[in-house]
Amino acid sequence: MLSYKKVLIVGRPNVGKSALFNRILDTKRSITENTYGVTRDLVEEVCKVGSFKFKLIDTGGFTILKDEISKIVVQKVLSSLEKVDLILLVLDVNEILLEDYQIIERLRKYSNKVILVLNKVDAKDKEFLAHEFHNLGFKRCFLVSAVHCRGIAKLRDFLKVEVGEANIEDEVNIKVGIIGKPNSGKSTLINYLSGNEISIVSDKPGTTRDFIKTKLTRNGKVFEIIDTAGIRRRARVNEIVEYYSVNRALKVIDMVDIVFLLIDVKEELTSQDKKIAHYVTKKGKGIIIVFSKWDLVKESKGYFEALKSRVKFFFPVLNFAPIFRISVHKKIGLDSLFKEAFKLKDQLEFKTSTPDLNKMLNLWIKDYHLNVSHKIKYITQVSANPVRFILFANKIKNFPNSYYNYLVNNLRKIGYNNIPILVELREKIRDLK
């Protein structure tokens, strides 16, 4: 799989790194909020300028704070410097602080690939402030305002020439979203899959705030894996940033083909897990229930089967969904998980012709004793991925649930065993004679 040249955005918190990242991408990808240390993970995205592409990476703020998360963020930034082709050092043109000087010193040995970006040059009369930064020793400098989009086009054109590559196509065969409560093992899994620590792993719940993308190849097919901030109950969302992360996690479900719903095997199933399951099925996405941290379980005979029965009782809406157990540390169940994802993707893309459907429908009707006042006319599949059917009847009021479920169960047997299928009842208008 071809790889893109990489551009890393670095700087202390609140200099506008994420706003610049979004402007260069021309989208709202990183969370931007006037709160210290909003971006924590490495947020990667392929940037397209004309027909040229490169990978743009937003980072957490370089800070002198000594708390655990701040130290992890700084270490992640420093470990990324060797691996990239260009470094955009973002400074606030209005002030330079101790943290700015600290990161400048760390960047000295990479000066040949450092581009100085002076942000918050919101008006022309601020351009004179740039002269105060010439003594920092970096040859290339851009004056921008990420908020007002000043200087962004010039910077994008520069990046296109310096690192942009044409005609690179990474066809993605399967998009997978890793969803679950905070600290359920999502970031550990995606770090293992990517081979890099792009997502912060900590014992503190809620350390991932953006969604993190990575690509990998399995059996000649390209997976795009998206990790999200943990979904928590809205009543407990106290910060604006956490609110955005919850909404972004729900948007990720909309973006992907298949969801891995990660559940910490040591935690109880919750109503929030159930709400996630309902949202996924309502959207017609494939879903695999994944119990993580299986290495922590002292397994007794029949424990996994009992656990699966409990899940099916707790999640009746997911009685079709596969259930897996994994341990990243012990390398348990990971290959099987991807094989199952291939299987689900095939089912999502399977489409049955209308004539074949109606032949089977006639057989199902004969095998079922239905109230004579409700008559099925015909059925058609209107889409794949999500799989949607429309079932036409002479009337839909008081349509028996038992018969509806009977039809859905029969539809599953023809090639949709492990995925949600959406069946809409419609009333067939009587032909006028």
Curated annotation (Swiss-Prot):
List, for all copies, the residue spans of the domain called KH-like. Answer: 350-429
Q: Which InterPro entries match?
A: G_ENGA (IPR031166), GTP-bd (IPR006073), GTPase_Der (IPR016484), KH_dom-like (IPR032859), KH_dom-like_a/b (IPR015946), P-loop_NTPase (IPR027417), Small_GTP-bd (IPR005225)
GTP-binding as UniProt keyword: yes
**Which terms in the Gene Ontology molecular function aspect does this entry carry?**
GTP binding
Q: What's the protein name?
A: GTPase Der
Q: Which residues bind GTP 1?
A: 11-18, 58-62, 119-122
EngA-type G domain residues:
5-167, 174-349
Q: Which UniProt keywords apply?
A: GTP-binding, Nucleotide-binding, Repeat, Ribosome biogenesis
A single Gene Ontology biological process assigned to it is:
ribosome biogenesis
**Organism of provenance:** Borreliella afzelii (strain PKo) (Borrelia afzelii)
Provide the binding site for GTP 2.
180-187, 227-231, 292-295
- Subunit structure, interactors included: Associates with the 50S ribosomal subunit.
User: So what family is this one in?
Assistant: Belongs to the TRAFAC class TrmE-Era-EngA-EngB-Septin-like GTPase superfamily. EngA (Der) GTPase family.
